[in-house]
Amino acid sequence: MKKVLFIGNSHTYFNDMPQMVKELANAAGEELHVTMLTKGGMDFAWHQKQEQTAFNLRYGGYDFCVLQQAAHPFPGQEALSEGTKGICELAGEHPPRFALYMTWAEKAHPENQGEMTEAYRRTAREQALLLAPVGEVWQAFRKEHPDIELYFTDGAHASPAGSLLAAAVIFKTL
């Protein structure tokens, strides 16, 4: 059995997306245990200050940790890079394998995806992390399947279909 810790905000917990990752793993014959440390609107700087973040990373015995930074507004490359490094450092001597969960641009601002994509790719490359390119896949899927609504009614969060897409990309990455 593999254990996965998800650290993020509403883009992680909407529609219980980590549970979808678990169900995809089960369907593929793999046993997965998932745990979430999430709070709406919070970024990596907030998570670094929470005792449960360090405790889970050091003592939870996780195989993977999926990291999702604040997305709307996206705080930029520097905040992503520094926040990612800070959380990874909390893990101590036996860290899980970290994966960055690249989010998607708001429906009203698809032009923002390029900046997000570059920042996530650069951070993953520089810190030798896995990358779940959900935002890129999201953008391509919308072009190929405009009839399937990936966004929740607020134009920022995921619909159930959007969460399933995110879960599939994350499962494939892990």
Where are these regions (language model features)?
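Alpha-helical cap/lid subdomain in secreted, periplasmic
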Residues: 54-160, 164, 168-173
